[in-house]
Amino acid sequence: MKSHRLANRYLAFLGIISGVLIAAGSAQTQQLQGKALVRALQRGGYLIVMRHASSPQTPPTKENADRQNINLERQLDESGRTAAAAFGNALRRLKIPVGQVLSSPTYRALETARFAQLPTPMTVPELGDNGRSMQNTNESQSAWLQKQITKFPRGSNTILITHQPNIAAAFPQWSANLSDGEALIFGSDGKGGATLVARVKIDEWPKLPD
């Protein structure tokens, strides 16, 4: 009898473990893709946290700098400008409403918004690079970004343009191998917090279906 009870307990334990694994698997597959992602974004209510588009690590010389780049900051390269423009065109083609745009004050982040033809961005120090070209970030920036993604807009989407170290510090569990221009898209978790619903590379936006 004792061995029978132990066997039943073992089977019950396996059942619990299986349930946990299934739940974990379901959580991993709840990210939106393709048409489902487009439809969700068309309804609005999401935060799109993106890394600025491609930019060389070395700032330009005075001779090579854009006319507006008076402080000789890092600026987008041709690939970055093209990708940012295609990203913006995709948002308009897909009729994805964009309300507020928050941006790092850096030239390369503002360029990303400009080439994408997004609404005029509001510059936010917490999204910036602290003037150190992102050698490190600080806890207050991470806390600000973590709080910001719980402010869900109604009927539109908010875009935040920042830097890889800021995103990695705030969301280490979701930001591994984040590429230039890639976005993390956050929605409500139904409990007052935010959850990741998609990761979209900047060159994937033009491929999304109408």
List PLM regions with ranges:
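Histidine-centered catalytic micro-motifs
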Residues: 50-55, 160-167
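Short, solvent-exposed loop/turn segments at secondary-structure junctions
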Residues: 131, 168-169
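A short, structured loop/turn motif at beta-sheet edges
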Residues: 151-155, 189-192
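N-terminal signal peptide c-region/cleavage motif recognized by signal peptidases
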Residues: 22-24
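A short, acidic, amphipathic alpha-helical segment used as a generic capping/interface helix at domain edges
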Residues: 142-151
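Bacterial N-terminal signal peptides that target proteins for export
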Residues: 2-14
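Active-site-proximal alpha-helix that buttresses catalytic centers in soluble enzyme cores
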Residues: 30-125, 130-133, 139-140, 174-184, ...
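Generic beta-sheet signal
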Residues: 45-47, 154-162
